[in-house]
Amino acid sequence: MIIETPSKVILFGEHAVVYGYRAISMAIDLTSTIEIKETQEDEIILNLNDLNKSLGLNLNEIKNINPNNFGDFKYCLCAIKNTLDYLNIEPKTGFKINISSKIPISCGLGSSASITIGTIKAVSGFYNKELKDDEIAKLGYMVEKEIQGKASITDTSTITYKGILEIKNNKFRKIKGEFEEFLKNCKFLIVYAEKRKKKTAELVNEVAKIENKDEIFKEIDKVIDEALKIKNKEDFGKLMTKNHELLKKLNISTPKLDRIVDIGNRFGFGAKLTGAGGGGCVIILVNEEKEKELLKELNKEDVRIFNCRMMN
């Protein structure tokens, strides 16, 4: 069995969402792939293909492990353990899980959540148990909480339900209709500009010290109001850029991110950083008439470029 799960971007509202305002997230087709197969050994074998790492655990060990002691395997192991517990299954046959991912790590695209959700789906499917989306999302959220100490529903819910979500106060609603149809026809670039210099928690703490942050968040919320009504790429791109300018006022951008956003504005419809900031990724709304020039300019920078579209 092979499971493919998306990653996610924040289109609007990062940081504001911490303070009870809205964020708009989108599942994208930068995916991770989880393959699960039965084996003849009494073992659970995990292969992280991109890191060229493997781990084997005896079947009776899995229930008693602390996943946090297993480094790069921790999300996958926690997802296996919690799914088996939830389904009340004592594994009797061994299985092997192969994990591959196109998603750059530690840059706000939900790489760990993608692997977590994929593993939950793979393990439940392996035992012919069909979990509902709300069960999968809840299990995924609990894995992230167990590993990270605290978590937001944004990554696990967006990756489970796909499409477009409006997140507020750790709850969400799925956005359908004209807005979803409009975004289906948009082509984006994710540009991994630079390694993040600070962790999300540090950036959130720094934003907390900004005196006029509430005014900035209210402006971001107005941008979301406008964006949800728009049906043309030019205006949507301008709102992405406006959101970026507001994020700059929170001091979470960097000169490199600003440079990539500027290229995205000149040769695309618009651009913004996505995620916590302090480095990481920029999302650009592609103007296909200028795409060659856009790629030419981006390739002068030391960046990684990923084509993506909404995944539903």
UniProtKB/Swiss-Prot annotation:
Q: Which HAMAP family match?
A: Mevalonate_kinase
Its pathway is:
Isoprenoid biosynthesis; isopentenyl diphosphate biosynthesis via mevalonate pathway; isopentenyl diphosphate from (R)-mevalonate: step 1/3
- The protein here is known as Mevalonate kinase
Question: What is the originating organism of this protein?
Answer: Methanocaldococcus jannaschii (strain ATCC 43067 / DSM 2661 / JAL-1 / JCM 10045 / NBRC 100440) (Methanococcus jannaschii)
Entry keywords, A to Z: ATP-binding, Cytoplasm, Isoprene biosynthesis, Kinase, Lipid biosynthesis, Lipid metabolism, Magnesium, Nucleotide-binding, Transferase
Question: What lineage is on file?
Answer: Archaea, Methanobacteriati, Methanobacteriota, Methanomada group, Methanococci
PROSITE patterns listed in its UniProt record: GHMP_KINASES_ATP (PS00627)
Q: What is the effect of changing K272 to R/A?
A: 13- to 26-fold decrease in catalytic efficiency. Still thermostable
> In terms of pH, how does activity behave?
Optimum pH is 8.0-8.5. Exhibits at least 60% of its optimal activity over a rather broad pH range, from 5 to 7.
